[in-house]
Amino acid sequence: MITTETLGARGVAVRAGLHRGWLETKYSLTDVGDIFWMLIFPVSFTVTLLFMRGSTVPGTDLALGAMVLPSLIGMSIAFGGLAGPAMQIATDREDGTLLRAKATPDGMLGYLIGKIWFFGLTTLASLVLLAIPAVTVISDLRIDGRTALLLPVIFVVGMIATVPIGSALGSIFKSSAQSMLIMLASMLLIAISGIFYPITAMPTWLQWVGQVFPFYWLGLGTRSAMMPAGAEAAEIGDSWRTAEMFAVLGVWAVVGLVLAPIVLRRMARRQTGSAIAAAREKIMTRGY
Amino acid sequence: MSDRESATEPTGLALDVRDLRVRYGSNEVLKGVTFSALRGEVVALLGPNGAGKTTTIEVLEGFRMPASGDVSVLGSDPARGDERWRARVGVVLQSWRDHSRWRVRDLLDYHARFYAPYATAEVPRPWDVDELLGVVGLTAHAEQRVMRLSGGQRRRVDVAIGIVGRPELVFLDEPTAGFDPHARREFHELVHRLSDFENTTVLLTTHDLAEAEKLADRILVLDRGAIIADGSPDQLALDLATKAEVRWTVGGERHVHAVEERDPTEFVRRLLATDPDVTELEVKRASLEDTYLALVQRVESGQAEEPEKLEALS
């Protein structure tokens, strides 16, 4: 039964969740380990730029580095939304964070809102950091009204397409150590998603694999928002395929939004103090 | 409608458990547990490790589904407890490394926020965070990160989070595990305060008899999934004591007799009636500690007998 009282309580939980996301972001920005992760993309981009000096996108006189920047932005969105929540949820389940949320009225709602807000904010922070090395190639890019409109939309759609599915994946893994597999899988998918190397230069079957996952489409979307006219010649079908991009990301969003609550609820039901004690025991003896 | 009113049991029972059974696969961990607790009562679930204490408390918290039995916690079935019910129940969890980089005050304040919509005229919710920090003795550590706290301090954070919503009922699973004597004593004072001033019902588990005696109005002894004794610490000593030792002196000679019946009075009466020279009479009943240890031992040796019986049958 939904009454005004429960609606009021939900509203309070959503606000508490936003507060949680903000606090966690603040804590994250003072944590050396987290800052290290946030710096990975900007630093790897800088290194990539150094290696790509003088190279151009095949068939154009565009600097290859200029193509990598938008792709990296897309990848940061996908990575922050997919691998981040997957690993975090596995950890939070093991250390009792989720059980605490369960023991609090509307605590699960607050927790989820907090996570989405947290990953949104930290992903945004790493994108801002990415802008620092980006100034060196900015002259090769087209930053205009279309960018200002498309980039935020892609950011939000990308978050909706990845955070739920990432959370669902995180709840499937039995332990936080297993969730590291997500990291590896993400790396593999990034390699074939046309971010560091044009996807058209890969074997056709690999192109198809790459096009199943959101990494490719987010990279394509951000390229379409920032690359100068004519750059679509380097893409599959000589087109930005904007409609297809939103369609594929939309499918991922729907799958995630349907799947995540089911999987999360199932996982949360299994959470008990003794399950956490068992996990603690295991980690204490094993050391990881 | 006030939720407080509708929830108040006419019987004054905060907890009512009847024939609770829990199974893990084919292993029955709770074999028909029955007990109840009055509002404001402090009840200790005492038993050796593996007795089923944690399983019992997890069912009552609504975190585990029982195989069968009737469970009522503040008038609701915990398996179907809604968020309003959840707001009236406090669960003190054992922290490990969760929220380790949060500052103590932030963490408590975050959890407190969820309870404000559930305040009633009688129960202002939540606790004032600074006041509660004072109550659990963490004022000086309010700005510290959870990971920098000692085990005892961290445990007090757990307690504070568990009671920040001013619950009517609090569950504490092995609350003082890993405490030094000083922290233990402070914690005991906190539990007394909860039951005396806040009229909070407390159910705690422990394997430490001394702690159960110090804290509880009533002790339930659980062993291998069944409650084998239920009563006040004094009652328990009476109920469980099987032996009392009677010592006396006649003509400079010391006598000792172990009375097998529960009540040694009859033996003493006969002794005094038959022998007028008895002096230095002394009746010593086994302490609750002796009784508990004997009981644990008895159950353990009973466990060893079962396979032998099986062998004899086959």
List each model region and its residues.
Chain A
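Hydrophobic alpha-helical transmembrane segments of multi-pass membrane transport/permease proteins
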Residues: T30-S55, G65-G84, L124-S126, M183-S193, ...
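Junction motif at the cytosolic side of a transmembrane helix
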Residues: I2-T4, A243-Y288
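Hydrophobic alpha-helical transmembrane segments of membrane proteins
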Residues: G59-Q88, I154-P164, S171, A260-P261
